[in-house]
Every structure is written in C-alpha cells, then in structure tokens.
Curated annotation (Swiss-Prot):
Protein name, UniProt field: ADP-ribose glycohydrolase MACROD2
GO CC, alphabetical: nucleolus; nucleoplasm; nucleus
Binding site for substrate: 77-79, 90-92, 97-102, 185-191, 224
Coiled coil start-end: none
Domain of life: Eukaryota
Subunit structure as annotated in this protein's UniProt entry: Interacts with ADP-ribosylated PARP1.
Family: Belongs to the MacroD-type family. MacroD1/2-like subfamily.
GO BP terms, alphabetized: brain development; DNA damage response; peptidyl-glutamate ADP-deribosylation; protein de-ADP-ribosylation; purine nucleoside metabolic process; response to bacterium
Catalytic reaction list: 2''-O-acetyl-ADP-D-ribose + H2O = ADP-D-ribose + acetate + H(+); 4-O-(ADP-D-ribosyl)-L-aspartyl-[protein] + H2O = L-aspartyl-[protein] + ADP-D-ribose + H(+); 5-O-(ADP-D-ribosyl)-L-glutamyl-[protein] + H2O = L-glutamyl-[protein] + ADP-D-ribose + H(+); alpha-NAD(+) + H2O = ADP-D-ribose + nicotinamide + H(+)
Keywords in alphabetical order: DNA damage, Hydrolase, Isopeptide bond, Nucleus, Ubl conjugation
Tissue: Expressed in the kidney.
Region annotation (Disordered) ranges: 241-306, 324-475
Disulfide bonds, paired cysteine numbers: none
Length: 475
C-alpha cells in the first residue's frame, strides 16, 4: 500500500534527512495529496466570510483587533493530510499503533514511525511524546495517551484529558512549532463522551493561548465525524467569539515574557491614581494635626497637675506622720469632749467628797446640839454648799494658818492640764477621800466626848474644826 516505505530501513538516518529538508523538497517526496495551512481559514475569517461581502471585509479588516479566534480553526477531514508542523496522535499506552486515528497515522507515516516509537518505551496517560512525521505531510507527530472512560467519566478522567492537551502544547512550545492539529482524543473506542471532550479541549487550549498568544500561528481542531463537527461548531462561538479582543492577553504575554514588574514600580496611570489618596491623606493629617497637638498638650498638662497634687499629698502625709511621732498630737473634737467629761467627773467627785465629809461632821454635831443650834448649823451648811472654797466668807471665818493652806491648795484642785493629769488627780483624790472621812470622824468623836456642858463658843469652834482637819489632811 505504501511502496515507498520499503526503501526506508533505518529510522534515525531517515529522520535526520527529512528534518534537514525544506518544505519544497519535502513536497517532492509526498506520496499522497496534502492540505496546506494557507487553505484552512481561521475561525474569525470563516465567521466573517459568512453573511458579509468581500468589500466590507476589506474595509473593516484594518480596523479589526486581534483576538484568539484568529489562532484557531475548525477542519473536518483526514488529519494525515494536513501540512502543518505537527499533528497529535490519540495513541495507546504502548505507542505501537492500534485502531482509529492511531492506526491511520501509523499507516500513513510508514514503518520508521513504529520503529522510533518502540524506542520510547510507551507513554503514561495524560503525557505526550514527539517523533518525526516521516512520510506524513506533517513534520512531527505528537503522541498522547488519553483516558479510557467507556461512557462514564469522573474528575480524574477530565483531568487526564486536559493534561493530554497541555502536555502536547508544551512540546509544541519546546520545539518551536508554529502550527499543530488536534484530533478528538479518547472519543473513539476509549468511550469519552463527545460533548464533554470538546468542552475540555476548547477550554484547555483557550487557557493556554491566553498565556502563549505569540508562540503559535494556528491550532486546528480536526474532526472526522459529523457529530463532532456540529458540537465543535456550536462551542467554538462560545470559547472563541469573533468580537473578543486580545488586549488583555497581550498584556499577560508581556508580563510572562518580561517577568513581573518590581514592587516599587507601577504604571503611570496607577501612579496618578495613587497620588490622589496620598495628598488627601496629607491634607487630612494637616487638618487633624493641630487638634491632636492640642489634645496632647492638654493631656500632658493634666498629667503634670495630677503629679503635683500627688507630690503635695505625699508631703502632707509625711509631715503628719512626723508630727505624730515627734510632737504631741493635736487634740480632736472628740478627745476634747472626752477630756471635759473627765474633768467634770473629777470635779463632781471632789464636790461629793467634800459634801459627804461635811454632812458626816454636821450630823455628829447636830445630834449633840439643841434645836436652835441645829438651825444655825443648817444655815452654815447651806452657805458653805452655795459658796466656793475661795469665797470671802470662808476667809473671814478661817484663821491665818487656814487661809495660807487654802491658798496653797487651790491650784492643786481646780485646773487640770491634760487627760493624763486629770486621771491621775482623780485617782489620788479617790484614794485620799476615805482618809479624810476617817480623820474627820475621829476628830469629831474626840471633841464630842468632852462633855455636854461645853459653851456655845466651843460648839462653834467644833463646827469649824472639820474644815481644819480636812485642810490638814490635804496638806
């Protein structure tokens, strides 16, 4: 069937020879017809040719913007006839040929393709390997192994199918190939549903083209069945619309080729946009600056005042503490009231003791005196109770010795300096009171035993003697 294949025995030599030939030299050795790339319209050209005249196309052609639809084409026919840089073979894992498109490519390429594939040691699912095209119009053949779905697909099947297209496009870029044709991978005997397979193929290639727009001139979707052709024709408008411009993809391409921009640099329009918020921030900072300064100064003043008050309080507390330790404490109103109460109690005790002594002495005298004399004694008692010890009446009745004793005794009884002296004075008087009573009683008894016939003068002297004994005891 392919008589020229009998002459080719060593695949390495044949590969080197064919790869060194020009396109014209290779065409002389084609055994079959071929379809050149120039005869295949891009998707954009095909869509514009429908419903528009040639004149309109020529007028609008200079105004057209570049889009991804210029990079893709839809072709229905035999993939082995395409004169492109590479065609993709939907191979099996052994890469030794099989049914469907794989068998067609091996038969058209000749025995050298099989010989080279034997040295590749097979291929994994989702991966791809490249060989020479040999007797094919295509310069290279890229072999990829698709997933075996058999009518039921899952996430791993979709991922493997997408990897088939990505791996093939990677080899295209690495070998500097400008055109490539893809068949429908895994849709034949492998049982991958046609429409999901078309969606994965179109989406994966569009994503790659957006990043590698300048790396290829044409990617061809080659279908053989009517079902696949209708599906692709419908989906092509969705993935590659004619009005879609590629300005964004060009910018992405430049960024990928030139590398990421430094962080410190940005495009001019971005700088102008960034300056406006900075100026507004500066103005807002300037406006809020005086207020913040004023608040800061007020806070500092308040803190200083608080610190000064604390310092004064500490000093006052220190002075109070020192005064309490080294000097006599300042009497409080409560302590003064207590001192006055103690003084009143002490004076009351003194008065009571004097009264008691007088009452005892007078009671003894009254028992011995007549009724007329009892009245005189009562009168004298009333006078002594009403008058103070320092009155003029007492000084007249008392003798000169008694007057000196009374003058000496007055400062000891009347004023008290402090609480301690008042307490001590009260205790001393309390102790002396019984002695006074005892002595007064003894003297009165001694005088009363002298006899009932004592005259009036002696009785009057007996009335005054208790005061003398009291004064002597106090001395």
């Amino acid at each position: 069937m392919y008589p020229s294949n009998k002459k080719k025995k060593v695949w390495r030599e044949e590969k080197e020879r064919l790869l060194k030939m020009t396109l014209e030299e290779r065409r002389k050795e084609y055994i079959r017809d071929y379809v050149s790339l120039s005869t295949i319209l891009s998707w954009k050209e095909e869509m514009k040719s429908k419903g528009q005249n040639d004149e309109e196309n020529t007028q609008e052609a200079p105004q057209m913007k570049k889009s991804l639809s210029e990079k893709v084409s839809l072709y229905r026919g035999d993939i082995t006839l395409l004169e492109v840089d590479a065609i993709v073979n939907a191979a099996n894992a052994s890469l030794l040929g099989g049914g469907g498109v794989d068998g067609c490519i091996h038969r058209a390429a000749g025995p050298c393709l099989l010989a080279e594939c034997r040295n590749l040691n097979g291929c994994e699912t989702g991966h791809a390997k490249i060989t020479c095209g040999y007797d094919l119009p295509a310069k290279y053949v890229i072999h990829t192994v698709g997933p075996i779905a058999r009518g039921h697909i899952n996430g791993s099947h979709k991922e493997d199918l997408a990897n088939c297209y990505q791996s093939s496009l990677k080899l295209v870029k690495e070998n500097n190939l400008r055109s490539v044709a893809f068949p429908c991978i895994s849709t034949g005997i492998y049982g991958f549903p046609n429409e999901p397979a078309a969606v994965i193929a179109l989406g994966t290639i569009k994503e790659w083209l957006a990043k590698n727009h300048q790396e290829v001139d044409r990617i061809i979707f080659c279908v053989f069945l009517e079902v696949d052709f209708k599906i692709y024709k419908k989906k092509m408008n969705e993935f590659f619309p004619v009005d879609d411009n590629n300005e964004g993809t060009d910018a992405d391409m430049k960024e990928d080729s030139e590398g990421p921009e430094p962080k410190g640099l940005s495009p001019p329009h971005k700088k102008s946009k960034a300056k406006k918020p900075e100026s507004s921030k500066d103005s807002s900072e300037d406006e809020s600056g005086p207020e913040e300064k004023q608040t800061a100064e007020e806070m500092e003043g308040q803190s200083q005042e608080a610190g000064g008050l604390r310092f004064l309080l500490r000093n006052l507390l220190g002075l109070i503490h020192r005064d309490g330790v080294n000097t006599t404490p300042v009497p409080s109103p409560a302590s003064e009231d207590k001192a006055e109460v103690h003084k009143d109690e002490d004076s009351a005790k003194d008065d009571n003791t004097v009264k008691d002594s007088d009452m005892t002495n007078h009671s003894v005298c009254d028992q011995e005196l007549p009724n007329g004399q009892e009245n005189d004694s009562a009168k004298s008692e009333g006078k002594t109770e009403a008058e103070s010890p320092s009155s003029s009446m007492e000084t007249e009745d008392l003798s000169p010795n008694q007057e000196d004793a009374a003058i000496v005794e007055q400062p000891e009884v009347i004023p008290l300096i402090d609480d301690q002296e008042a307490q001590e004075g009260g205790e001393a008087q309390g102790k002396d009171a019984p002695a006074v009573f005892a002595e007064s009683q003894g003297s009165s008894e001694a005088e009363n035993t002298s006899g009932p016939d004592v005259d009036m003068n002696s009785q009057v002297d007996g009335v005054n003697e208790p005061t003398e004994s009291l004064q002597e005891d106090l001395q």
